[in-house]
Amino acid sequence: MGALTIVAKYMIVAQIEVNGGVDKSDIIGALFSQTEGLLGKDMDLRELQMMGRIGRIEVDIQEKDGKTKAKIYIPSNLDRYETALVAALIESIERVGPYPATVKVLEIRDLREEKRKKIVERAKELIKMIEEEILPDTKEIIEKLKEDVAKAEVVEYGPEKLPAGPDVDKSDWIIVVEGRADVVNLVKHGYRNVIALEGISRGVPQTIIDLSKRKSITLFIDGDKGGEMVLKELMKVAHIDYVARAPPGKEVEQLTAKEIAKALRNKVTLEEWLAQQKAGAEKTEAAAPPPQQPTAPPAAPSQQPIAEVPQEIVKRLGDMQGTLEAELYDTNWSLIKRIAVRELPDELANSTDSIYAILMDGIVTQRIVDLAAKKGVKIIITARVGPLTKVPEDLKIVTFEQLQKLA
């Protein structure tokens, strides 16, 4: 196929079959002569070619057994409607010289689309070249610039002047981290709804406690024992919705954008976290040799509350398992309300009902214990018990397993 004489938008590709031996000039001549005047002067092939609306017609010919088969290529600078009309026009050819002939259009290529694909592929190559040739010093400058911008965006929040991102008030959920460097790193990577505890040696800041009452909290801890200590202290006084953790041995301030995104994507609810920690502890205890002086077992539930739990409630334990729901009862063991376990802290804090007992498929946390005690709850029947630092004497906590064994 020869070079094009115009900058074409489309390429008409057709196939012609002639019942006899002919050459290229015969086929091209038939195209011009047999289409002349069919669609008027404006669509005459010679006129279109003279005006540069179609390019040079190329023919790729093959002759076999006295018959001729050829591919016809017509570059077009017309719009798609006119190009389609020209394609249909050449299909009207019935003879080449003295021989019968048929023409069929095989395709109309969009040459601009092919150019676009080549441009995109070349752009990919150029981007790769740019990325490979950026000097390490340049990358360091960019990282330093990002960090400086992030530091400038860090604000002081609350009476304690805690380091925070600029969007703590705007966002419905916030990320709580340990220190200022953690805040700077998260802001640098686009997380602006972050605030720091600034250590827990002097207790959890009241600002964090207040925020936990009105916003969803994700605690993002370091991947070491220190992170676990922060979690234990915070869960005593504040409501934590989710826990995210840095990879083992890494601190939040050291994480890359990809590591931060992965850790936050893999966050779990506080209940799931505590269950995982308990399962890990039980596995470790099972693998370890018996201690010389075994620690005291968890206090056995009082027989008095066990005895007063109605059999209908005991029978409900099987139905409750796996629901992640909580049921609230009055002193007559009449059902007051059934809610999701995650809604229990808010219900205990705001409900005006007199609640005597709670049946819940979840983990009892110190926050739930504190709210239940304040509400006057006397019995909590639960699937699991998390780490507790203080339980009032008049509040009895019993697990499903204990109740089923003793009932």
Curated annotation (Swiss-Prot):
Bilayer-crossing regions: none
SMART domains xref list: TOPRIM
Cofactor: Mg(2+)
Positions with a binding annotation for Mg(2+) 2: D222, D224
Entry keyword annotation includes Nucleotidyltransferase: yes
Self-association and partners: Forms a ternary complex with MCM helicase and DNA. Component of the archaeal exosome complex.
Role: RNA polymerase that catalyzes the synthesis of short RNA molecules used as primers for DNA polymerase during DNA replication. Also part of the exosome, which is a complex involved in RNA degradation. Acts as a poly(A)-binding protein that enhances the interaction between heteromeric, adenine-rich transcripts and the exosome.
Protein name, per record: DNA primase DnaG
Species assigned in the record: Pyrobaculum calidifontis (strain DSM 21063 / JCM 11548 / VA1)
Gene (name only): dnaG
